Structure formats: C-alpha cells, structure tokens
From Swiss-Prot:
GO terms for molecular function: DNA binding. Coiled coil: none annotated. This is Heat-inducible transcription repressor HrcA. InterPro entries: GAF-like_dom_sf, HrcA, HrcA_C, WH-like_DNA-bd_sf, WH_DNA-bd_sf, WHTH_transcript_rep_HrcA_IDD. Negative regulator of class I heat shock genes (grpE-dnaK-dnaJ and groELS operons). Prevents heat-shock induction of these operons. The lineage of its organism: Bacteria, Bacillati, Mycoplasmatota, Mycoplasmoidales, Metamycoplasmataceae. Keywords: Repressor, Stress response, Transcription, Transcription regulation. NCBIfam families: hrcA. One of its GO terms (biological process) is negative regulation of DNA-templated transcription. It comes from the Bacteria.
C-alpha cells in the first residue's frame, strides 16, 4: 500500500485530470497522462481506498472515478501554485504605474486576471478601516452642489445635495457646514463619521439657522458608506457547466451584495487569510483577505466545482505579492 504522501499525490492527479477533461478517470488514463511508473492494479487499489475514504466517487456509467465534495476541497487546499508568466508580466506593468490609488490599481489587476485566466473575481474593501482624508464642495448652481470625499485608500465618493425643496437652506449654509466638517472630521474613520457629525450639533447651531436639515442631509446621504463589491467576468460563471439556473441566480445575487469571506464558514488552517468552500450546489468559492496599511481588501474567485483552483490560487497569491510592497506605508 502506498504511503499517505504518495496516495495524496495520486488523488491530486486524479482530480486535476477530471477538472481538465470532465470525464471519469480510469487507472489507465491516469498512468498514461502523468507517465506513472506503477501498475494499473496499484492505481485501482489506491482509487478504491480513496473512494472508501470519501474523496472519490464511482459513476454508474463508467469504471472511472470522479471527485466528491471532500475530494474537491482537498484539491483546492493542497494543490500547488504555478507561475503564469503572461499574467505576472501584465500585473508588473499595472503595478509599475505611479500615482494610481490602490482601488484603481486593483481594478486594473482584476480585469487582467479575468481576461488572461478567465475567472470570475469579486473585489471589495472594508470601509470600516478607512478614514476621511478630504471633503470638498463643488457648486453646480444656486440650488445644488456636489460633495467630493476622499478616503485614506484613495477612494473618491461623489455625493450630490439638492436644495430645491428646501427654501430655508442656502448654499452659503452648506459652505459653512463643509468648513466645519473640514476642521472637525478629517482623519475620522468612515464608520464613525455619522456619529461624529451628530456631535457637532452645538457648533453648527451657532452658524446655521436650519442646521438640523443640513445635518440630516449629510448623515443620510453624504456620510453614508457601504462595502461595495466589484464583479469581474460574470459571464465566465454563467457559461460554466453543471450549475443550475436557480443556484446561479442565487450566487450572482450573493456575490454582488455580500462579503464572500463572510459567506464561507470553513477555513484553511495554514493560512488564516484564505478561505475555501466547495458546495453541493456545484459552486466553489475562494476568498483572500489582504491587509494593507489601515484597510482590508477582499479578493475572491467564484466558479463551479470544476474551476481551475490552481490558477485561481496562483493569481490571488501573485496579486498579493504585488499589492503589499507597493502600498505598504514605508513605500508611500
């Protein structure tokens, strides 16, 4: 009987071949594909053991085996990364650009990964760790203005205030409010902006007659920040085989409106910043947290259970290797 390490190696090869071909894997196919110096009988015995342990399943129409959910999970967690020279070259080009914020850079990188590897990616930022760095007023006319806010990660938010229905409020009042917010709210964490703004009531009341109307407008609109997902290559998952329409609709809604990280209960013990989930609904999720300065970036890959786990993990690892050196504090 093979040692566990050898058996694990055989299991990885079986699943790798199945992911590539989509067909049940036989002992002869495995030996031929990977030029294994073992007999078919030995491979069949190993396959039988792996089936008994719940990593493989036998189909009714073939003598070959296919991965079980446990098998896919094992492959996703233990398969080794590989170098994609084209992707590495493209990311190097993107990250060499100066003066781009981390969000703009991440956007370009995610697009490159989608185009080169063909994965469905989701990126998001945890705004709870960001702070307000700038707030500016741009007047559009006598009754409306755009408020521009810039966060510590370079994220820019444009919020419009319309005073058409508030005849007792003038743009001069908004100017005064902006000046006070600049003095009191810069370097405040985004999650605390609304609370801190409310605490300015006594000061605002000294300078603005109808300060409560302005304050509620800022709290309800301008100072409202949410974690926003950006989805790349949505068509890739739509085209994948084996995902029924109901589950596809559910997963598309989830990835657009929820944290993939929080959706995954399981965790790879060796790396507390990486989570992998292989589901019975033929959906697989890989999510990585990358900590840069005072913010958290979430990079996730979504696909069917036959997704290219090796390329997905390799792309995430490569992306992290570029992000941290460029955007760490010592390099800013």
């Amino acid at each position: 009987m093979y040692m566990k390490e050898k058996r694990d190696e055989i299991l990885l090869k079986i699943i790798d071949l199945y992911i590539k071909s989509g067909q049940p894997v036989s002992s002869k196919q495995l030996i031929s594909e990977y030029k294994l110096a073992v007999s078919s009988a030995t491979i069949r015995n190993i396959m039988a053991d792996l089936e008994n342990e719940g990593f493989l399943e036998k189909t009714h129409t073939s003598s070959g085996r296919i991965p079980s959910i446990s098998g896919y999970k094992f492959f996703a967690e233990h398969s080794k990364s590989k170098t994609n020279e084209l992707l590495e070259s493209k990311l190097k080009e993107i990250f060499s650009k100066r003066y781009l914020s981390i969000d703009v850079t991440l956007d370009e990188a995610a697009k490159a990964i989608n185009e080169i590897i063909g994965l469905t990616l989701v990126t998001s930022s945890n705004v709870n760790t960001e702070v307000l760095k700038s707030i500016q007023l741009i007047e559009l006319n006598n009754y409306s203005a755009t408020i521009i806010l810039v966060t510590s990660t370079g994220q820019v938010a444009n919020k419009t205030i319309d005073l058409t229905n508030f005849q007792d409020i003038k743009l001069e009042d908004v100017r005064i409010a902006i000046r006070l917010f600049k003095e009191r709210l810069i370097n405040t964490s985004l999650i605390n902006l609304r609370e801190k703004a409310l605490a300015l009531k006594p000061i605002l009341s000294k300078y603005i007659k109808n300060y409560e109307t302005i304050l509620q407008s800022f709290i309800g609109n301008v100072f409202e920040f949410e974690n926003k997902n950006h989805v790349y290559g949505k068509s890739n998952i739509i085209k994948q085989e084996g995902i029924d329409r109901l589950h596809l609709t559910q997963i598309l809604d989830l990835i657009e409106n929820n944290s993939i990280w929080n959706m995954i209960e399981s965790k790879v013990e060796e790396d507390e910043t990486l989570k992998i989930d292989v589901r019975n609904s033929n959906i697989s999720l890989i999510s990585k947290k990358i900590f840069v300065n005072n913010t958290t970036k979430e990079i996730s890959v979504i696909g069917s259970n036959r997704m290219d786990y090796i390329s997905a993990k390799s792309a995430i690892a490569l992306l992290e290797s570029f992000i941290k050196p460029k955007f760490s504090k010592k390099n800013n």
